[in-house]
């Protein structure tokens, strides 16, 4: 994997320094009863104190070492302090065993210079053992438009992929197309009826057909192509199905691209059902054959531990209980047909065979019961491949009723017939909010929390709308920097100024607070990636905007260009750094635009 520019993670930097101090103190016999092998096993913890009086960073690790060392935490902290090698960083022992760190100005200047030098690459970090990860998300049926829930998985999945990439992993994004089974036959039947209706026939849609008016649009396109001589009118259900499938998949791809969500692979479920020309077996049959050879399948009239029901027939069961599932699962019915699980097993076997270290699936809350069986599938084929299943809650849309003035849930769409589509959320004249607002609000909560999407707030052009507030902050940086260059003829530089006393020439607390916030980007990305929590970057962007606007309001620049050039330059660089970090967060991580003027 190609190397990428590396930013300094301040938390990793301090963690390594404390770990080294523990090793040195242990070798010197100064940590009481702590054995050398115990010393190397300690993983120091670095935190950001809620009160800046306690330093920029703090380490509570001595408190946890007290029992192992049989020493007072404060004594351990004092010992570690003596072995710390941190020039330009002030260290204090406080709180009965905390190590508090305050970053010195020369150290901060180096980090700011690194930020300005790396530019669009600032925030990217490396890890000793990067993983090759397959991230599967959205994976909708190609039988209708994508709904708002799919939009949430698209926003979360694409942002998580960015986070994993920026923190050093090799990530591939995959969409599993559910294009097999009875649903595809129903899609073809529904299109055929719509075509016949447009031709003047009085024919009704079957009750279980797809009733959305989007199929009328597809039927019109089909008849238009027939009239233009591009294709003949379909004569079989298979031909109707294939046309509808192609149209729906193209629409879904277009919608996802509009939401700035790209995929590296589109995996068709049909592949799993197609016989291999060499073996004559489908991927499903090959997967079950391998499970049989590994001793994970058996025939029975009921799963192990349960009594058969009257009249039950013999089916093939997968021993999912051996991998933590609550009961064994049927993979082949008595009539010889395969269950949905059989296809899922074959699909995950295919993933395992492609050589990934880790598989991540993002699923809706209605798939919670799939966790055990999918982990069993991966575990049966390879104990070394890690599978993570992230379960997300759904989205409800709310808008003010113009008649009552109360917030009401928006449930229906004229276009789809029974739900609000992702297209509606983006571009509908009545409820559409645009791509940036859609992504922002779909990313704004942790995955395990449902989202109550306020459509009114999302289109507000005031600072109540967090998208507008963050966009405005970036645009404000750009506008000020343009003015400085074009009107004041200021030449921007990456060289950070220090006074003769090797101090940053800052005068106000807002300056240092903003700088610390900006330098935290690598650690914010690492934490969000490790916790699979893209919403944390939303909170981080809001915090940057708040800190920057406090700085902007309290720290003048233009009057200082002649009065105090050194301070003016230092403040200009904070504006440069803010613009860069917001740009990286908005475009590189969250998939939003970064307007240069508003």
UniProtKB/Swiss-Prot annotation:
<dbReference type="GO" id="GO:0004814">
    <property type="term" value="F:arginine-tRNA ligase activity"/>
</dbReference>
<dbReference type="Pfam" id="PF00750">
    <property type="entry name" value="tRNA-synt_1d"/>
</dbReference>
<dbReference type="InterPro" id="IPR001412">
    <property type="entry name" value="aa-tRNA-synth_I_CS"/>
</dbReference>
<dbReference type="InterPro" id="IPR014729">
    <property type="entry name" value="Rossmann-like_a/b/a_fold"/>
</dbReference>
<dbReference type="Pfam" id="PF03485">
    <property type="entry name" value="Arg_tRNA_synt_N"/>
</dbReference>
<comment type="similarity">
    <text>Belongs to the class-I aminoacyl-tRNA synthetase family.</text>
</comment>
<keyword id="KW-0067">ATP-binding</keyword>
<dbReference type="InterPro" id="IPR005148">
    <property type="entry name" value="Arg-tRNA-synth_N"/>
</dbReference>
<comment type="subunit">
    <text>Monomer.</text>
</comment>
<protein>
    <recommendedName>
        <fullName>Arginine--tRNA ligase</fullName>
        <ecNumber>6.1.1.19</ecNumber>
    </recommendedName>
</protein>
<keyword id="KW-0648">Protein biosynthesis</keyword>
<keyword id="KW-0436">Ligase</keyword>
<dbReference type="GO" id="GO:0005737">
    <property type="term" value="C:cytoplasm"/>
</dbReference>
<keyword id="KW-0963">Cytoplasm</keyword>
<feature type="short sequence motif" description="'HIGH' region">
    <location>
        <begin position="140"/>
        <end position="150"/>
    </location>
</feature>
<dbReference type="InterPro" id="IPR035684">
    <property type="entry name" value="ArgRS_core"/>
</dbReference>
<dbReference type="Pfam" id="PF05746">
    <property type="entry name" value="DALR_1"/>
</dbReference>
<dbReference type="InterPro" id="IPR036695">
    <property type="entry name" value="Arg-tRNA-synth_N_sf"/>
</dbReference>
<dbReference type="GO" id="GO:0006420">
    <property type="term" value="P:arginyl-tRNA aminoacylation"/>
</dbReference>
<dbReference type="InterPro" id="IPR009080">
    <property type="entry name" value="tRNAsynth_Ia_anticodon-bd"/>
</dbReference>
<dbReference type="InterPro" id="IPR008909">
    <property type="entry name" value="DALR_anticod-bd"/>
</dbReference>
<dbReference type="InterPro" id="IPR001278">
    <property type="entry name" value="Arg-tRNA-ligase"/>
</dbReference>
<dbReference type="GO" id="GO:0005524">
    <property type="term" value="F:ATP binding"/>
</dbReference>
<keyword id="KW-0030">Aminoacyl-tRNA synthetase</keyword>
<keyword id="KW-0547">Nucleotide-binding</keyword>
């Amino acid at each position: 994997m190609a190397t990428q520019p590396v930013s300094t993670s301040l938390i990793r930097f301090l963690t390594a320094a404390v770990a080294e101090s523990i090793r040195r103190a242990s070798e010197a016999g100064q940590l009481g009863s702590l054995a050398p092998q115990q010393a190397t096993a300690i993983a120091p913890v670095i935190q950001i104190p809620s009160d800046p009086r306690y330093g920029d960073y703090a380490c509570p690790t001595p408190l946890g070492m007290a029992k192992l060392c049989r020493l007072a935490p404060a004594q351990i902290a004092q010992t570690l302090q003596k072995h710390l090698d941190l020039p330009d960083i002030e260290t204090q022992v406080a709180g009965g065993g905390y190590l508090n760190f305050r970053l010195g100005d020369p150290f901060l200047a180096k980090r700011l210079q690194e930020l300005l030098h790396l530019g669009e690459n600032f925030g990217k970090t490396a890890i000793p053992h990067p993983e090759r990860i397959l991230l599967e998300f959205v994976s909708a049926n190609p039988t209708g438009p994508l709904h708002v829930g799919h939009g949430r998985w698209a926003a979360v999945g694409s942002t998580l992929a960015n986070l994993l990439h920026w923190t050093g992993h090799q990530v591939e994004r995959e969409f599993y197309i559910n294009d097999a089974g009875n649903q595809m036959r129903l899609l073809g039947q529904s299109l055929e009826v719509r075509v016949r209706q447009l031709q003047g026939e009085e024919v009704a849609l079957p009750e279980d057909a797809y009733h959305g008016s989007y199929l009328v649009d597809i039927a019109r396109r089909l008849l238009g192509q027939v009239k233009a001589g591009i294709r003949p009118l379909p004569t079989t259900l298979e031909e109707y199905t294939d046309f509808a499938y192609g149209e729906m998949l193209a629409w879904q791809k277009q919608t996802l691209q509009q939401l700035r969500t790209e995929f590296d692979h589109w995996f068709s479920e049909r592949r799993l059902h197609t016989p291999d020309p060499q073996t004559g077996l489908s991927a499903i049959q090959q997967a079950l054959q391998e499970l049989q050879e590994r001793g994970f399948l058996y025939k029975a009239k009921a799963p192990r531990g349960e009594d058969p029901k009257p009249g039950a027939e013999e089916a093939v069961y997968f021993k999912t209980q051996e991998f933590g599932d609550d009961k064994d699962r049927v993979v082949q019915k008595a009539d010889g047909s395969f269950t949905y699980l059989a296809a899922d097993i074959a699909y995950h076997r295919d993933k395992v065979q492609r050589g990934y270290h880790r598989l991540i699936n993002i699923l809706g809350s209605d798939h919670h019961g799939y966790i055990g069986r999918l982990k069993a599938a991966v575990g049966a084929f390879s104990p070394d491949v890690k599978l993570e299943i992230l379960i997300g809650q759904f989205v409800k849309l709310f808008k003010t009723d113009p008649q009552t003035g109360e917030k009401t849930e928006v449930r229906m769409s004229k276009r789809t017939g029974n739900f609000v589509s992702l297209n509606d959320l983006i571009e509908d004249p009545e409820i559409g909010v645009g791509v940036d607002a859609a992504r922002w609000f779909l990313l704004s909560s942790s995955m395990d929390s449902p989202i109550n999407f306020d459509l009114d707030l999302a289109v507000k052009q005031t600072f109540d709308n967090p998208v507008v507030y963050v966009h405005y902050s970036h645009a404000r940086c750009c506008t000020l920097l343009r003015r400085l260059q074009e009107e004041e003829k200021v030449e921007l530089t990456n060289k950070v100024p220090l006074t003769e006393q090797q101090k940053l020439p800052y005068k106000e607390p807002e300056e240092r607070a903003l700088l610390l916030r900006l330098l935290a980007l690598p650690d914010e990305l690492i934490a969000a990636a490790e916790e699979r929590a893209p919403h944390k970057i939303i909170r981080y962007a809001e915090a940057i905007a708040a800190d920057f606007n406090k700085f902007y309001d309290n720290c003048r620049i233009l009057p200082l260009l002649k009065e105090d050039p050194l301070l003016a330059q230092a403040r200009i660089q904070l504006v440069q750094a803010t613009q860069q970090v917001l740009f990286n967060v908005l475009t590189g991580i969250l998939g939003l635009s970064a307007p240069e003027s508003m």
